[in-house]
Design a protein with these regions (language model features):
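Helix-to-loop junction immediately C-terminal to a conserved catalytic motif
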Residues: 48
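ABC ATPase NBD Q-loop/coupling interface
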Residues: 57-79
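Conserved ABC ATPase "signature" region
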Residues: 116-134
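Conserved ABC ATPase signature
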Residues: 139-143, 147
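Catalytic Walker B motif of ABC-type/P-loop ATPase nucleotide-binding domains
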Residues: 164-167
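Helix N-cap at the start of a conserved alpha-helix in ABC-type nucleotide-binding domains
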Residues: 175-177
């Protein structure tokens, strides 16, 4: 669970987040809804420590207990990120890495696994998002946009996160593929009891995915 309490954030004197409060629950797809420019992305970035808030609290129920993001050091924020998966508007894959190597990247950065365990975990995550094995060794440019998004989801869950942040996850996808991605995010959220936060202005996606 994440508790946002009375959060304030301004840029150059312009208030973007004005005493925002909300609870984001485990095992559910929690929606941040609003038109473009309403502050959705600012709130999400504030919740993962990419923006420093001007006031209020953002409290995570981490594996080590409750932690207030507002009082964390830079090192503590990095430690928190080990429990956070992130899915960006674009798939944001590394063009120079294969599909499997992209999923292994967070494991290389943050885990103490052996090389064999990293490969096994990456392949498990790719299978979980229904990627065909023949695609594991392909480059991102060799697969479709929908498949790229699947790879991005596999990478986001590689570290077995407690929290999954999705910024416009259906951006650039056709309606049919969007439904598939929505269902995949829902299934993973419930299966692993993840606290998932989705930022969207797409009403069709909101009705399909949100709890």
């Amino acid at each position: 669970m994440i508790q946002v309490k009375d959060v304030v954030k301004s840029f150059d004197g312009n208030v973007v987040l004005n005493h925002v409060s909300a609870n984001f629950e485990d095992g559910k797809v929690n929606m941040i809804i609003g038109q473009s420019g309403s502050g959705k992305t600012v709130l999400m970035k504030s919740m993962i420590g990419l923006h420093q808030i001007d006031g209020g609290e953002i409290v995570f129920d981490t594996r080590a207990g409750q932690q207030n993001l507002a009082g964390m050091t830079e090192k503590e924020v990095r430690m928190l990120h080990r429990e956070v998966g992130m899915l960006f508007q674009g798939a944001a894959l590394f063009d120079s890495m294969t599909v499997q190597e992209n999923v292994m990247y967070p494991l290389e950065m943050f885990s103490d696994m052996t090389d064999e365990e990293k490969v096994e975990r990456a392949r498990f995550c790719l299978e979980r998002v229904n990627m065909p094995e023949r695609a594991f060794g392909l480059m991102p440019s060799e697969i479709s946009g929908g498949m790229q998004k699947r790879v991005a989801i596999a990478r986001a869950i590689a570290l077995n996160p407690k929290y999954l942040f999705c910024d416009e996850p259906n951006s650039g996808l056709d309606p049919r593929t969007s439904l598939v991605i929505d269902q995949l995010i829902q299934d993973i959220t419930r299966e692993y009891n993840i606290c998932t936060i989705v930022n969207s202005h797409d009403m069709n996606s909101i009705m399909e995915i949100g709890d």
